[in-house]
Structures are given as structure tokens and as C-alpha cells.
Amino acid sequence: MGKKDKRSKLEGDDLAEAQQKGSFQLPSSNETAKLDASQWPLLLKNYDKLNVRTNHYTPHVEGVSPLKRDIKNYISSGFFNLDKPSNPSSHEVVSWIKRILRCEKTGHSGTLDPKVSGCLIVCIDRTTRLAKSQQGAGKEYICIFKLHEEVEDDRKVKQALEKLTGALFQRPPLISAVKRQLRIRTVYENKFIEYDPAQQMGIFNCICESGTYVRTICVHLGLILGCGGQMQELRRNRSGICDENENMVTMHDVLDAQYLLDTQKDESYMRHIVRPLEALLTQHKRVVVKDSCINAICYGAKILIPGILRYDDDIEVGKEIVIMSTKGEAICIAIAQMNTSTIASVDHGVVAKSKRVIMERDVYGRKWGLGPVASKKKQMVKDGLLDKFGKPNDTTPKSWAKEYVQTSTKKEVKKEETPDEEEEEAPKKKSKKSKKQESSDSDSD
């Protein structure tokens, strides 16, 4: 008989408390973990199942787990899954929240028409950097439509809705916030729910691409049935990874949480309704990097093989991935330059290039240029074995060319070549100028 697993599966408030108070780094200890890795929070979930490239790195004191941030940073790097009320526009709601929280900026993940209610992801301060990534995510709606004439059978309505799936031509309605030009939008599924012949009204569920007008789908439904139709009511069930069944808050919750924080210094309500920005990235493939290279990435450096600790399965070239720290903080969204099998087999090269940096600069200390290769390179420049730009010259030893791997891209090499070409062109221009001057002198004579 094997040893019994002492780790218990926690649920509800107990799980939330354990995630907030627990330490999810791996210190050397004989104690059993309180939580199974499948219950670790946010980007650290199933951390033990990631592919390991190396376990050797120096942990830094800077940085903190997303759930343990102080309340100011917790709010500025968080978002709401807001239940938008009917009548005010999305921009009005977002500006009200900005005024309530007294934050620098707010944004949202896709406009809802004034009369439409439901999921609206409201991003605060630093999280606005992720608003674009959520705007392109899929949306799900529940719609009530009304037909202008009677329909003999419910099945006709169901068949007509099934026809309105796939890539559809749409022109925005007469009253809309965008230019009325023909465009293609994809409807993934139209699920018929109910139809009442007496009221000539029905309900259906629509899963579609962002930017799809459900109002236009209702008009097209009426055209297919030959009786005309219109949308009566609409609610968004899901926006990206957030749906109405999970952590949805109202405007009153935001007001109450801010009131408690201001008057009684009680953070619990605010921490309950605000979610860390890492929750928006849980569907992305992950790459974990060393603490020493985090600040370099924040300054725009590429993600190289020596800086990687762990990485996910099924990473594909050209796809978006999230670069994270060992504490579970999101550093940036990057475009993968290698797949999983390549990362496992090579010893140098560019793994990914950053697309959108999320973490602020200088949260972690500057550690670039302190490694053994960089230190040796600096010394060689000082001794004159390399030129002032760190490139080989006549005195450079041959062993250096074999040891040192240049990771600069082709574009950078081309840029370096262009000045020589310009120098060659310069004498030609001068000669042309001199000829002109001679001709002008002859004219004046």
C-alpha cells in the first residue's frame, strides 16, 4: 500500500483563503503541501505538469503573488466582470467606475449598445493593456425576437436559425456607432430555445465573433421566413473567458466596496469583486522565466533559451503565449518563435518576442550584463580584443567566434550594412554638386 495523500480538496471560501494566504514557491521542507497543484491560483494552476528545462535559478525578493498585492496595486492591476445595466452606454458606465475608484484610466473589452445588458469586462489602469486581447475574443448572447406575421411551425424558425450560421455578410443597423459598410462576421452557433405563436416572439442563444450585430441576425431571420422580424431584447451571457455565472458584480457592489475601503479600511469586499489581470490569461500557453531576466523583458528584450525555467506543451510558432514569473505574475504577452519540441532540443536562440508588456519596469532589479559571457565580453572590449560595439576586430581570438552566439535578427544586420552603402553614394552626390557649381560658374561668366 502506498502512502495516503494528505492534501485535501478544498472548496468555496476555504479554497479562496488558502490561495490568498499560501506560498506557492517551492521551499525545501518536509511538510506536505496544503493545496494540490491543480488548485493553485491563476497562472500557477498545474504548475507541476509544465515541462522543466532547468530548476537552477536565484529567487529575488522583489515581486509578489497576484493575490497578495497591496490593495492599491491589487486594484490598479485588476478588472471587474460587470453586469452592465440597460440604458447607459458602455462608455458612461466605464467613466462612472473611474470616478468611483479614483483611478487613472479604465477601459472595456467590447462595447454594448445602451439597451443591451450583461457581461462587460471593465479593465482598471494596468489591465487596460489587455483590453485589446479580450475585444477579439468570442461573445455569447441570449436574444428575444419578434416576427411580424404568424409562422405555421416552430421547426421553420429553427431551420432558419441554423441557416444563419458560419460566415455571414452584415451591414450595421441604421442607428449604430460604426460606418455602415458591408462586412463579414462569423456566427458559430444559433441555438433555438423557445417560440410562442400567440405573441409571435421567440428566444435563441447566439455564439458569435466579436463585432457581430445580433439585431441584423433577427432582421435576416424575418427575411428568410418571409414575414419580417426584429430584435426585442438582448443580453450578453459571455465575453471572452468571463460569463454571467462567475464573479459577476453590479455597480452597487463597486460603490459599496469603495465606501467600505474609504470609511472602515476594510479591503475584503474590494478583493472579492476585483480579479487580478492574470485571470484573463489562464487560457494562454505559459512560459516561466528566471527572476534575473524579468526586468530586461519589461524593457523590451527578447525571451531567450537561457532564461527559461518551465514551458507548456503544444506551444506553436506564431501563437500568443504568456510569459510569467515563478510567483505567478504575468510579465508580457509574446509571439512564440519556437514550438515545444524545439525549446526542449536547442541550447540557444529566441523563444519568443514580446507583443505587449504588462508588468511595470524596475519592479525587479536590473540584472542584465552580469552573466559570465557578458562580463567576459566587457573585459574584451576594455582590453581592445573587441571594438567599442562588442564586435570582432583584427585582434579578436578565434575561440571567441566559436563560443559566442550572435542572436541579432536579419533586420539589424541589414541596418548595419546600410551606412557603408550611404558612404559610397555620398561621393557621387558630391561630384554631381560640383558639376552643377561648375556649370553655374560658367553661366555667370
Swiss-Prot record:
Q: What top-level class of enzyme does the UniProt entry assign? A: isomerase
Provide GO CC annotations from the record.
box H/ACA snoRNP complex
Q: Which residues form a coiled coil?
A: none
What biological process terms from GO does the record include?
A: box H/ACA sno(s)RNA 3'-end processing; mRNA pseudouridine synthesis; rRNA pseudouridine synthesis; snRNA pseudouridine synthesis
The PUA domain covers 284-359
Q: Which domain of life is it from?
A: Eukaryota
Ranges where the record places region Disordered: 1-32, 386-445
Where in the sequence does UniProt note compositional bias of the Polar residues kind?
20-32
Q: Does the keyword DNA damage apply?
A: no
- Pfam family name, one: PUA
Main subcellular localisation: nucleus
Residues the record marks as active site: D113 (nucleophile)
Keyword line? Isomerase, Nucleus, Ribonucleoprotein, Ribosome biogenesis, RNA-binding, rRNA processing
Q: Which reaction does it catalyse?
A: a uridine in RNA = a pseudouridine in RNA
**InterPro entries per the record?**
Dyskerin-like, PsdUridine_synth_cat_dom_sf, PsdUridine_synth_N, PUA, PUA-like_sf, PUA_sf, tRNA_PsdUridine_synth_B_fam, TruB_C
Q: Name one GO molecular function term.
A: RNA binding
* Known partners and oligomeric status: Component of the small nucleolar ribonucleoprotein particle containing H/ACA-type snoRNAs (H/ACA snoRNPs).
Reported function: Plays a central role in ribosomal RNA processing. Probable catalytic subunit of H/ACA small nucleolar ribonucleoprotein (H/ACA snoRNP) complex, which catalyzes pseudouridylation of rRNA. This involves the isomerization of uridine such that the ribose is subsequently attached to C5, instead of the normal N1. Pseudouridine ('psi') residues may serve to stabilize the conformation of rRNAs.
The protein's name: Putative H/ACA ribonucleoprotein complex subunit 4
Which source organism does the UniProt entry give?
Caenorhabditis elegans
